[in-house]
C-alpha cells in the first residue's frame, strides 16, 4: 500500500514537473521577457554598459550590504553544477542549437530580472537589526495588499531553496570529493555542515561577505580553463558558432531537431539564470543601492543574468563543443561529458580542477540559497526561535543530502520552483506600472546628468512604503494627516 502511494506521488510529481518545465513555464517566462523588453525599450541593450559600471561601482564601502556583495550572492545561487552538467544535458538532448536559444532567453530574462529586483528594492523593509529585507513576498503584501500570496510564495521558496536544493548541492559535493579523492561521504558531510553553519549563523551580512570572496575566485578560475580550451582550438570557433546557429534554425540535423534545440535551450536558460523566478530578488532587496535608487539594483541583477548564462554557461558549451567529444559516441552525459571534454583537452589533472570547481560552486550555492530562504522565514514570522530552528533544519538537510540520494525530494523542489515562478510572474505583471515609472525616473535623471536618487513623494500612486527607507517619517506622517483631513 505504502509503495503504491509513493509510486503515485512520484508519478504525479514527475507529470507536474514535465508540464511546468516542458511547456507552461517556457511560454509564461518567454512572454514576460518579451513584454518587459518592449515596455522598457530594450534597456538591457541600451544601458548594458551602465549596468556593468554599477556592478563595479558597487564595490565601494557603505553601511550595510553593498551592491557588489549582493551581486556576488545572487551569482553564488545562480551559478552551480547546472551551469556545467545542465549545459551538457541541453547539448546532448537538443544539439548545439540549444546554446542559441539559451542565449536568447537570457537576453529576454535580463528585462524580467530588472523588473523584479527594482520592485524588491521599492517595497523593502528594515528589520529589528537594521538589515534590509524584501523580495516577492514583500511586494506582494505591500504592493498588491495580498499577504496570502506572499505567504504561498515564501513557503514554496523555503521548500525549494532552503531545504531541497541545498541537499542537492551537498550531494554533488560529496560525490565529487568521493570520486576524485576517495574521501568518506559522512566525513565530507560533517565538514560541509560545519562550514555552512559558520556562515549562515552569521546572517545575511556574513553570507554576503563570504560570497564576495568565493564568487570572483570560482568565476575567474572556471573562465580561465574555458579560455585555455578556446585558445588551443581557436581555428574551430567559426565552425562551432555556425553549427550553433544552423542547428537552432533547423538547417542542420540535431539530436532533437530545431524544436528539441529550442525547448532544451530555453529550459536550461530559464532554470540557470532564474530570471522571473523571484529568487534573486530576495537578496537584491538587501542591498544599500549605489546610486540610492531602486532601479540601480535592477541594473545589477540584469548583469547577473548575463554573466550566468552568456558567460558561464557559454564557457561550458565551448569546452564541450571544441573538445570533439560530441563527434564520437561515448555514452557520457551531464557532468561526465564535461569531464571527458576537459580530460581530452587538458589531461587527467582536470579531474581535480573540476572537483575544486564543484566544491566552490556548490558551497556558495548552499549559503546563498539559505539567504533567500531566511528572508522568507522572516516574512512569515519575526521569531528568532523559529529562525534558529530553521537553520538547524537546513543543516540537517545538508547532512542528509551528503550521504543519500533524494530524487523524490529534488523533483518536488523543481515543482515548488516552477509554482513559485508562476506566482511571481503574476505579481510583477500586476505591479509592472510601478516598476516602469520608477525605472523611467532613473533614466530621466541619468539623461539630465545627475546621480539618480529616489524621491518617493513624486510617486503618490506608490503607497505602503516603509518609513525611513524611501519615505522619511515626517513625510509619512504629513501624508497620513492630509488623507485623514
Question: What are these model-derived regions, one by one?
Answer:
Residues 115-124, 225-243, 256, 285-291, ...:
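Extracellular/periplasmic helix-exit of transmembrane alpha-helices
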Amino acid at each position: 500500500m505504502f509503495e503504491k502511494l509513493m509510486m503515485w506521488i512520484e508519478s504525479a510529481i514527475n507529470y507536474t514537473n514535465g508540464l511546468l518545465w516542458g511547456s507552461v513555464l517556457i511560454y509564461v517566462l518567454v512572454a514576460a521577457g518579451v513584454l518587459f523588453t518592449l515596455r522598457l525599450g530594450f534597456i538591457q541593450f541600451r544601458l548594458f554598459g551602465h549596468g556593468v559600471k554599477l556592478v563595479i561601482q558597487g564595490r565601494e564601502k557603505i553601511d550595510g550590504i553593498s551592491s557588489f556583495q549582493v551581486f556576488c550572492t545572487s551569482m553564488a545561487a545562480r551559478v552551480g553544477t547546472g551551469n556545467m552538467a545542465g549545459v551538457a544535458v541541453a547539448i546532448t538532448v537538443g544539439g548545439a542549437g540549444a546554446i542559441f536559444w539559451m542565449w536568447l532567453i537570457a537576453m529576454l530574462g535580463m528585462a524580467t530580472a530588472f523588473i523584479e529586483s527594482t520592485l524588491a528594492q521599492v517595497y523593502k523593509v528594515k528589520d529589528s537589526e537594521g538589515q534590509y529585507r524584501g523580495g516577492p513576498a514583500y511586494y506582494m503584501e505591500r504592493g498588491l495588499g495580498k499577504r496570502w500570496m506572499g505567504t504561498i510564495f515564501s513557503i514554496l521558496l523555503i521548500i525549494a531553496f532552503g531545504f531541497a536544493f541545498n541537499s542537492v548541492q551537498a550531494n554533488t559535493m560529496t560525490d565529487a570529493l568521493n570520486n576524485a579523492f576517495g574521501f568518506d561521504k559522512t566525513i565530507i558531510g560533517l565538514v560541509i555542515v560545519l562550514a555552512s553553519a559558520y556562515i549562515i549563523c552569521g546572517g545575511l551580512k556574513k553570507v554576503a561577505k563570504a560570497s564576495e570572496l568565493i564568487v570572483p575566485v570560482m568565476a575567474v578560475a572556471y573562465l580561465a580553463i574555458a579560455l585555455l580550451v578556446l585558445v588551443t582550438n581557436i581555428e574551430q570557433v567559426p565552425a562551432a558558432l555556425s553549427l550553433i546557429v544552423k542547428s537552432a534554425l533547423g538547417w542542420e540535423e540535431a539530436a532533437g531537431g530545431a524544436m528539441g534545440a529550442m525547448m532544451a535551450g530555453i529550459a536550461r536558460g530559464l532554470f540557470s539564470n532564474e530570471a522571473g523566478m523571484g529568487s534573486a530578488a530576495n537578496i537584491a532587496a538587501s542591498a544599500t543601492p549605489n546610486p540610492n535608487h531602486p532601479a540601480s539594483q535592477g541594473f545589477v541583477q540584469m548583469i547577473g543574468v548575463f554573466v550566468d548564462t552568456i558567460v558561464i554557461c557559454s564557457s561550458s558549451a565551448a569546452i564541450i563543443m571544441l573538445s570533439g567529444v560530441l563527434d564520437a559516441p561515448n555514452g557520457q552525459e551531464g557532468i561526465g561529458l564535461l569531464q571527458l571534454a576537459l580530460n581530452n583537452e587538458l589531461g587527467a589533472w582536470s579531474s581535480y580542477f573540476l572537483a575544486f570547481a564543484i566544491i566552490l560552486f556548490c558551497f556558495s550555492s548552499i549559503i546563498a540559497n539559505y539567504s533567500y530562504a531566511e528572508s522568507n522565514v522572516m516574512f512569515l514570522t519575526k521569531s528568532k526561535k523559529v529562525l534558529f530552528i530553521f537553520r538547524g533544519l537546513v543543516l540537517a538537510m545538508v547532512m542528509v543530502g551528503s550521504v543519500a540520494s533524494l530524487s523524490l525530494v529534488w523533483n518536488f523542489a523543481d515543482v515548488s520552483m516552477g509554482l513559485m515562478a508562476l506566482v511571481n510572474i503574476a505579481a510583477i505583471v500586476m505591479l509592472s506600472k510601478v516598476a516602469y515609472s520608477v525605472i523611467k525616473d532613473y533614466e530621466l535623471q541619468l539623461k539630465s546628468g545627475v546621480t539618480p536618487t529616489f524621491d518617493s513623494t513624486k510617486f503618490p500612486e506608490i503607497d505602503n512604503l516603509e518609513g525611513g527607507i524611501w519615505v522619511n517619517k515626517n513625510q509619512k506622517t504629513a501624508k497620513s494627516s492630509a488623507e485623514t483631513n
